[in-house]
Amino acid sequence: HDFSLVPPADTMLDVLQQAGKSTIGVGKIHDIFAGRGMTEFTYTSGNTDGLAKTLAYADKDFHGLCFVNLVDFDMLYGHRRNPDGYAAALQEFDSWLPGFLEKLGEDDCVIITADHGCDPGYRKHTDHTREYIPMIALGKKIRPVNLGTRAGFCDIAATVTELLGVPYQTPGRSFAAELV
């Protein structure tokens, strides 16, 4: 488990929960946010379990956010500098994704990203690495558009809350209008 400090202010999860939206954590999301802002959460034993649990949530009718952490990318392959394991995990995810996307509703949006760089091929240390992280938005009504380099995760929080119709004061700039 991660033993995080309580966030000093309301997070996106807090404001969504306060607005009556579902905030579902899969993996260690509950721990990352010190147990705050979750209406429901489930731990996972690794990526394969996380993908299965995420697919199960896609079958449920909820209005809100399902926030997923696939920990093996970081814990088993990134920090352990295991590029072969990382590649196999990416292939597993790539094989899983089409079945998940088929389950999405008309207005659903999926944002795929990472929380930091963790190059499995970098050998000087096992800490986080400094490359930019990818962010991909998908959904039946999501337009394919280059969003450029974003300021940070605050842009994702601004976008998610706007898409869910919940006001949230954040330094982030929503890119919802560019997507839908």
Task: For the regions a language model picked out, list residue spans one by one.
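Feature captures the catalytic ectodomains and active-site-proximal regions of enzymes
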Residues: 1-180
